[in-house]
């Protein structure tokens, strides 16, 4: 049986990553590819990279194809376009980028360390209303909230 981290590790052999620091410099220079945030809508609404689009991981595959309720034309038409996939910690984005590559996307990378790393680098973030979210607020919003019953028994 494979665990989640095993799946991520396998996908990392096939997926390129870009660090928040390297991509942040490029982003701030105005050279911005398609930013695809695959977190859940509530996560995205709380904070995201300005200019990113939200397509939750659970509907990603349908969003990349025509004729579905979830179809996102920008994605369907973007198979040759440079795409940076974003999640909270950089794991879901690796799995999503791997699937997108299998679906014919030729220039897709995962944001290493996810939006957490972006926040740690104190790069621009906003909420659903377009209000700036500073790094301290980002720390609070991105803090792990694993409950005792969710932890592995000892």
Task: Locate predicted features.
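Short, surface-exposed ligand- or partner-binding patches at beta-edge/loop junctions that are enriched
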Residues: 86
């Amino acid at each position: 049986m494979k665990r989640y981290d095993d799946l991520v590790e396998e996908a990392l052999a096939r997926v390129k990553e870009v660090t928040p620091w390297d991509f942040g410099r490029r982003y701030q220079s105005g050279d911005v590819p398609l930013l695809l945030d695959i977190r859940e809508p509530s996560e995205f609404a709380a904070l995201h990279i300005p200019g990113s689009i939200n397509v939750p991981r659970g509907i990603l595959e349908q969003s990349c194809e025509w004729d579905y309720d979830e179809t996102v034309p920008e994605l369907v038409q973007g198979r040759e376009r440079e795409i940076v996939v974003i999640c909270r910690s950089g794991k879901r984005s690796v799995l999503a980028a791997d699937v997108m590559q299998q679906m014919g996307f030729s220039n897709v990378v995962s944001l290493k360390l996810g939006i957490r790393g972006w926040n740690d680098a104190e790069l621009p973030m906003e909420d659903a209303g377009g209000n700036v979210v500073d790094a301290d607020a980002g720390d609070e919003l991105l803090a792990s909230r694993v409950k005792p019953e969710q932890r592995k028994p000892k």
